[in-house]
Each structure stands twice: as C-alpha cells, then as structure tokens.
Amino acid sequence: MTHTTLFTSESVSEGHPDKVADQISDAVLDALIGQDPNCRVACEAVVKSGMVFVAGEITTNAWADVEQITRNTVLQIGYNDPHLGFDGEACAVVTAIGKQSPDIVMGVDGREDQELGAGDQGLMFGYASRETDVFMPAPITYAHRLVRQQALLRKNGRLPWLRPDAKSQVTLRYENGKPVAADCIVLSTQHSPEISQESLREAVIDEIIKPIMPPHWLDKHTRFLVNPTGRFVIGGPVGDCGLTGRKIIVDTYGGMARHGGGCFSGKDPSKVDRSGAYAARYVAKNIVAGGLADRCEIQVSYAIGVAEPTSISVETFGTGKIDEVRIQQLIKEHFDLRPGKIIEELNLLRSIYKATATYGHFGREEPEFTWERTDKAEILREAAGLAAANVTN
C-alpha cells in the first residue's frame, strides 16, 4: 500500500531583510576573525528603511570599520538605488558594541585548545538523508535553488525588472518516504513597477522554476503560485524590518529535522550554537554517506565552560543498518565533539562565514564548507562491518 504525504520548505533570497541582517553580522565576523582568529564575536543587526543598527559583544585585538562593512554588504546585495527605499550609500549606520562578559571569558578562554569550554549551554541538531545528491531534504534544497536562480537572473541582467527581495516555497509529494512530484511551488519576487503581472508570471515559471525543478516532478497537477498578492514592488527593509537570526529553519533543514533554537550568523565558532550544529551535520552526513542509515538526526548538547558534550543522541527513523546504540559508540570513537577539536577539525578560524549567510548552511559544495566533507564515511562503514556504500560527495 502506498503511503502518500506532503512536505513543505521555504527559502528566502539574499535581499530578504532578515538575510540582509545575517549577511551584515557575518561580514563583521569575517573581517575580525581574518585578523584575530581568537576573537570573540556576537554581532547582531537590525535593518529597517533607511537605517542599520549593529550591536553586540566583541572582544578582539583586531579592528574593523563596521560602518563601511555594513554599507558594502548592503550594496553588494543590490540595494544601491535610492528609489528602492534602502540604499547602502545613504542609509544611517548606528553601532552599539560592548565586550564579552568576563564571567563567560572565565569558562571559555585561557585553556588548551582541546579543552576550550563551550561558549554557552545549548542543544544542536544535525541531519542528513539520501533524498538528494547533497544528502539534504529535497524541499529545502530546491527552495534554495529557486531563490538562488532569482538572484542570478537579477544580477546578470536577464530579467532586469527583478529586485533583491524574494521568497520561495516548495511542497513535494512523498510516496513511501521518497519525493515523487511537486505539488505546489510558490515564488514571490520583488519587481519594478512597470512589469505586468502576466509577463512576470510567465518569466518566473519559464526562467526560474522550470530550469531548477526536476522535470519529472512537474505535471498537470503542479500548482505554480507566482506573487500571489499580485504586486510586490515595496520590499526589502522598506517593507519589513530585518533581524539577525530570524531564519533558522531556512538556514538548516527546512523543518525536516529538529532545531535547538540558536542561530548561526554573527557568532564566532566558540559559540556551539554554530560550531556544534556544523559538527552535528558533519557526523550525520558521514553516517548516511557511509551507509549506516538512509536518514540520520544527531543531537548534541553542551554546558557553558565545559568542553565535553553533556549528551549525544542518534535517531535513524527506522532506516539504520546497525543498531543506534552501536552508531552512538562509533560517533564517540571517530568524532571528537569538544568545541576546540571541532574548530580544529573543521578549520573554522577563517573568514568563511558571510558565504553561509544565504542559501543555507548545509548541502553546499563550496570548499570552505568543511562540515560537508564525507571523509569519515568509509571509516565508519568499515567499523560497522558493512558492505561498500555509494558515497557521492
């Protein structure tokens, strides 16, 4: 008997106000960590109309021109015209930055690297599955690809009436746990006022959606909802206030896996909200790539100032090829999840973070996304006593 379900995930473009804020926060982090790898950064941004407010706690020997970094980031995104209502050249930039609390420093700094204490308590999840070639859920993967295509066509001038703000939403039909068809695709994009809705709809379907979605998933039952309100001229920080860390499901697995609640952007890797989640993805992906399970979710938790995780747990949703207790043992044998060792293993003390602030932190193939490596898949497979797995990444 066929078991049919629907699952939906969304993504947003680099011009979405929350993503503007994320990119500013990570651009500041990149500027500092490139000079001072041991900097402590917790940088937040708020964007609205003609203003950007950058605040947080930063302890470093480096210097960064936060105002200019902010302006450059906004301009690179595409907010470079006063007629858009938000312009990187003209917007006000206000900063309020203090230092990291000495009470936190006590538990995090001044130790050997491998004994670096977690920057805060918290729980993080990592997930992987065989749904796509990047070991990610299909709905979020294609939602990201749609808004990335929107940005590409905007920037290369093929669709010159596109503007920076956009959102996508992909609903896939699953049969017995496998994606088989696209039920509904939503694409909302900001646009210049002169384009007709008919022309916009036709171009979005033909130039953005169809080149990205697998053609065998599109049939007569697939619904295309393009700018469902009929008009999207006012957008970006003019239409909505943007805030760092407000797109945590877009940043991760599109709702297919659980989330511990902590955001990533603007945080240096001593914050386990970020490094712990990256490590959990690394573990889960290698487990699936190694053939130990077809789906895997890892939870890891920490206490502030303590290096060793307070817990590690495994869920394979009935797809495990060996017992979950054995998988947990293999994790402890082959992955060191202390923050200092995560930072060392994944080479996280580099200016790599602004690239993560758009189109998802996972399922990416760029070399700086070290947590996407599957270099331990074969080791895990052999340790589990399994036949050769089909490792595709």
UniProtKB/Swiss-Prot annotation:
Name of the protein in question: S-adenosylmethionine synthase
SUPFAM superfamilies documented for this protein: S-adenosylmethionine synthetase
Gene Ontology biological process terms from the UniProt entry: one-carbon metabolic process; S-adenosylmethionine biosynthetic process
Binding-site list for L-methionine: E57, Q100, D240, K271
Pathway annotation: Amino-acid biosynthesis; S-adenosyl-L-methionine biosynthesis; S-adenosyl-L-methionine from L-methionine: step 1/1
Pfam short name (any one): S-AdoMet_synt_N
Task of the protein: Catalyzes the formation of S-adenosylmethionine (AdoMet) from methionine and ATP. The overall synthetic reaction is composed of two sequential steps, AdoMet formation and the subsequent tripolyphosphate hydrolysis which occurs prior to release of AdoMet from the enzyme.
Cofactor: Mg(2+); K(+)
Binding site for K(+): E44
One annotated Gene Ontology cellular component of this protein: cytoplasm
Residues the record lists as binding ATP: H16, D165, A166, K167, R231, F232, D240, R246, K247, K267
Entry keyword set: ATP-binding, Cytoplasm, Magnesium, Metal-binding, Nucleotide-binding, One-carbon metabolism, Potassium, Transferase
Subunit-level organization: Homotetramer; dimer of dimers.
Positions contributing to Mg(2+) binding: D18
Cell compartments where the protein resides: Cytoplasm
Family of the protein in this entry: Belongs to the AdoMet synthase family.
EC number(s) from the headed UniProt entry: 2.5.1.6
Cofactor notes: Binds 2 divalent ions per subunit. Binds 1 potassium ion per subunit.
Gene Ontology terms for molecular function: ATP binding; magnesium ion binding; methionine adenosyltransferase activity
Catalytic reaction equation(s): L-methionine + ATP + H2O = S-adenosyl-L-methionine + phosphate + diphosphate
InterPro entries: ADOMET_SYNTHASE_CS, S-AdoMet_synt_C, S-AdoMet_synt_central, S-AdoMet_synt_N, S-AdoMet_synthetase, S-AdoMet_synthetase_sfam
Region (Flexible loop): 100-110
